[in-house]
UniProtKB/Swiss-Prot annotation:
Task of the protein: Protein S19 forms a complex with S13 that binds strongly to the 16S ribosomal RNA.
Location relative to the cell: Plastid, Chloroplast
GO biological process, alphabetically ordered: translation
GO molecular function, one term: structural constituent of ribosome
Protein name, UniProt field: Small ribosomal subunit protein uS19c
Organism this protein belongs to: Nicotiana tabacum
Length: 92
Protein backbone atom coordinates (compact mmCIF):
# COMPACT_ATOMS: atom_id res chain seq x y z
CA UNK A 1 0.00 0.00 0.00
CA UNK A 2 1.15 3.51 -0.68
CA UNK A 3 1.31 6.28 1.85
CA UNK A 4 -1.85 8.35 2.29
CA UNK A 5 -1.84 11.65 0.40
CA UNK A 6 -3.12 13.39 3.55
CA UNK A 7 0.23 12.72 5.21
CA UNK A 8 3.48 14.42 4.32
CA UNK A 9 6.45 12.36 3.09
CA UNK A 10 8.62 10.97 5.88
CA UNK A 11 12.02 12.60 6.29
CA UNK A 12 14.07 12.09 9.46
CA UNK A 13 14.32 15.29 11.50
CA UNK A 14 18.10 15.15 11.89
CA UNK A 15 18.52 14.73 8.14
CA UNK A 16 16.18 17.62 7.37
CA UNK A 17 18.08 19.90 9.75
CA UNK A 18 21.41 19.03 8.10
CA UNK A 19 20.00 19.70 4.61
CA UNK A 20 18.49 23.04 5.65
CA UNK A 21 21.74 24.12 7.31
CA UNK A 22 23.74 23.33 4.18
CA UNK A 23 21.19 25.09 1.96
CA UNK A 24 21.42 28.30 3.99
CA UNK A 25 25.23 28.20 3.89
CA UNK A 26 25.18 27.20 0.18
CA UNK A 27 27.85 24.59 0.91
CA UNK A 28 28.27 21.12 -0.51
CA UNK A 29 29.52 18.35 1.76
CA UNK A 30 28.71 14.68 2.19
CA UNK A 31 25.89 14.00 4.65
CA UNK A 32 26.21 10.65 6.44
CA UNK A 33 22.92 8.98 7.39
CA UNK A 34 21.47 5.67 8.52
CA UNK A 35 17.92 6.76 7.63
CA UNK A 36 17.09 4.58 4.62
CA UNK A 37 13.35 5.14 5.10
CA UNK A 38 13.51 8.89 4.45
CA UNK A 39 11.85 10.14 1.27
CA UNK A 40 13.88 12.29 -1.11
CA UNK A 41 12.41 15.80 -1.28
CA UNK A 42 13.27 18.67 -3.68
CA UNK A 43 15.45 20.48 -1.12
CA UNK A 44 17.90 17.54 -1.24
CA UNK A 45 18.66 17.94 -4.97
CA UNK A 46 22.34 18.58 -5.61
CA UNK A 47 23.59 17.16 -2.32
CA UNK A 48 25.62 14.00 -1.83
CA UNK A 49 24.21 11.74 0.88
CA UNK A 50 26.13 8.72 2.18
CA UNK A 51 23.48 6.05 2.85
CA UNK A 52 24.25 3.09 5.11
CA UNK A 53 23.77 -0.33 3.50
CA UNK A 54 24.42 -2.37 6.65
CA UNK A 55 28.17 -2.51 6.19
CA UNK A 56 29.34 0.86 4.88
CA UNK A 57 28.05 4.23 3.72
CA UNK A 58 27.56 4.58 -0.04
CA UNK A 59 27.73 8.17 -1.34
CA UNK A 60 24.77 8.94 -3.62
CA UNK A 61 24.40 12.20 -5.57
CA UNK A 62 20.74 13.30 -5.48
CA UNK A 63 19.18 14.32 -8.81
CA UNK A 64 15.70 15.56 -9.68
CA UNK A 65 14.61 12.16 -11.04
CA UNK A 66 15.08 10.65 -7.55
CA UNK A 67 12.49 12.91 -5.87
CA UNK A 68 9.70 10.88 -4.27
CA UNK A 69 11.79 7.73 -3.85
CA UNK A 70 13.27 6.45 -0.59
CA UNK A 71 16.99 6.78 0.18
CA UNK A 72 17.30 3.04 0.76
CA UNK A 73 16.36 2.28 -2.84
CA UNK A 74 19.72 3.57 -4.02
CA UNK A 75 21.93 1.66 -1.55
CA UNK A 76 21.53 -2.10 -2.11
CA UNK A 77 22.05 -4.25 0.97
CA UNK A 78 22.71 -7.57 -0.75
CA UNK A 79 25.39 -8.52 -3.27
CA UNK A 80 24.25 -11.24 -5.67
CA UNK A 81 27.39 -13.01 -6.88
CA UNK A 82 25.67 -15.48 -9.23
CA UNK A 83 24.48 -19.03 -8.91
CA UNK A 84 26.91 -21.80 -8.01
CA UNK A 85 28.56 -23.43 -11.01
CA UNK A 86 28.06 -27.12 -11.70
CA UNK A 87 30.97 -28.66 -9.84
CA UNK A 88 30.58 -32.34 -10.75
CA UNK A 89 34.35 -32.62 -11.27
CA UNK A 90 35.11 -31.62 -7.69
CA UNK A 91 32.73 -34.23 -6.25
CA UNK A 92 34.48 -37.21 -7.87
Amino acid sequence: MTRSLKKNPFVANHLLKKIDKLNTKAEKEIIVTWSRASTIIPTMIGHTIAIHNGKEHLPIYITDSMVGHKLGEFAPTLNFRGHAKSDNRSRR
